[in-house]
Amino acid sequence: MSPRPLAWALVLLGAALAVALALGSAPAPGAREKLCGHHFVRALVRVCGGPRWSSEDGRRVAGGDRELLQWLEGRHLHGQVSDGDPMLVLVPQALPQASLHHHHRRAAATNPAHYCCLSGCSRQDLLTLCPH
């Protein structure tokens, strides 16, 4: 076998291998990815693309991750509820020890950041969390 066809065969094999690796390593569009802490926040900012959360020129946005986490935890609503109607203010009540575990599990299920960390979130899941 002459060196010329062998060289072409190696070039074609290398190109095919590169394409196969590129396609194999790309996550599927609906794939779930475990996102914890700042990885969750950054993925949410990237998906939502809000001008208050991501800057075009790379400058850090005032409030940054802290503002987004507070929004996700619903802290922005606490003052509004107590100012509007005193009957709506929730008074914490002691839970019996037996139901404490179930309460924690139920709270974790409703916290999107905790859910994405434990079970993973798809891009579509993150889009449902966008405020706009």
UniProtKB/Swiss-Prot annotation:
Identify the tissues in which this protein is expressed: More strongly expressed in testis than in ovary.
Domain of life from the UniProt record: Eukaryota
Q: What is this protein called?
A: Insulin-like 3
Q: Which residues form the signal peptide?
A: 1-24
Propeptide positions in the record are 61-104
User: What are the annotated disulfide bridges?
Assistant: 36-117, 48-130, 116-121
- The species is Canis lupus familiaris (Dog)
Q: Name one GO molecular function term.
A: hormone activity
Q: Tell me yes or no: is Nucleotidyltransferase among this UniProt entry's keywords.
A: no
